[in-house]
Amino acid sequence: MSAGDTLDKLVVFLAKRDGIDKLVKTFQYVSKLAHWAAESSSPGLAGRAKNWETSAGLSRKAFRTGRFLTGLNGLRRAPGEFGALAVLANAGEMVYFFFDHFTWLSRVGVLDAWLARRMSFISAFGESVGYVFFIAMDLIMIRRGLRQERKLLREGGKDKDKEVKKIRMDRVMRLMATAANVADLVIGIADIEPNPFCNHAVTLGISGLVSAWAGWYRNWPS
């Protein structure tokens, strides 16, 4: 691939809201790990890293303005083959992004600061519920794909090879989505039920980067 092709794809990637979000999310969690690593040895550097993390986190909330409409639109449509799973996944996503607006506004001083913790909890709860059901749906589809792939491989034929390739590409994308959702679920649990493992800076940092980089892969132009 030429440098021009890569630059063209980067421009397309960053033109998407999800593309910008994944880039800033990378900044957010790299700076979290940098803060943790420098906290004891270089407090000044750690403070700068913390400021970068905070700024990136607030910027991502601003980028997500109106994103709850995606979940609302999903609820408006027929639930399809997944039925209740799809309804609960979209409802959780809608709650997450809707209350995230209030978390953002309270943290930047537009609303009372005491609201931030409460709104963050509600948002994280909705987020976690949504991720559980999105993960379940992706795992169901991966299982179906594996069964279909085995069937096609038994039958053989050139046309079947194309279908198998398509199934495998879909599986990779769903595995990436599952990895991102599991990582984000860990971050959500840290907000809902703080504990030493989920709330450790390394756990949060690695989880955030796994989610961000899986998103890079899924959204990168083909």
From Swiss-Prot:
Expressed in seedlings, shoots, leaf sheaths and flag leaf. Keywords: Membrane, Peroxisome, Peroxisome biogenesis, Transmembrane, Transmembrane helix. Its main location: membrane. One of its GO terms (cellular component) is peroxisomal membrane. InterPro entries: PEX11. PANTHER family: PEROXISOMAL BIOGENESIS FACTOR 11, PEROXISOMAL MEMBRANE PROTEIN 11B. Involved in peroxisomal proliferation. This is Peroxisomal membrane protein 11-4.
